[in-house]
Amino acid sequence: MNSLSTSAFSLGLLLVMATAFPTPGPLAGDSKDDATSNSLPLTSANKVEELIKYILGKISALRKEMCDKFNKCEDSKEALAENNLHLPKLEGKDGCFQSGFNQETCLTRITTGLVEFQLHLNILQNNYEGDKENVKSVHMSTKILVQMLKSKVKNQDEVTTPDPTTDASLQAILQSQDECVKHTTIHLILRSLEDFLQFSLRAVRIM
């Protein structure tokens, strides 16, 4: 991807973010508006859905590259790596599933989880040996997705930031001289983010 196409991509994503949510209506005095204010507007939900699909496509390409170029497909060592990384997951208590769905709780958890993944993607971007443009695209798109979703969270203080020690721990793993550990960690991050986004996509569709 040349600099011109990269700039065009960045501009396109920023435009998506800028138009993701319509101008807010009256803050009070309209009971009908109050009744529907908890739901994502149709156009907003569509834009969020399309952005998630875009990110999933890029992740799929990166995972294929990991498999083809580094022979890093499914691996039994991932179970150990997963325990060490504590990557974000969506669980029943997060209110994102059909049973027990809670939009505010779900939006907060998805946004917080993506903020955590941003940290991993930032470090991954600096250590990935394959298609760095795809990694940059995933990182940038995820950042925009966070902003789109966070704007709909009522109590934004509930969106927590990652523990700084996570940064140092992951950095140490990815700078390891053990290529197998490094590639397994990258593969796991991509796979976990893919799973997280797939569950998020289902949740967005019922908001």
UniProtKB/Swiss-Prot annotation:
The modification Phosphoserine is found at residue 76. Residues 1-20 form the signal peptide. It comes from the Eukaryota. Keywords: Acute phase, Cytokine, Disulfide bond, Growth factor, Phosphoprotein, Secreted, Signal. Disulfide bonds join 67-73, 96-106. The keyword Amino-acid biosynthesis does not apply. Belongs to the IL-6 superfamily. This is Interleukin-6. It comes from Canis lupus familiaris (Dog). The lineage of its organism: Eukaryota, Metazoa, Chordata, Craniata, Vertebrata. The gene is IL6.
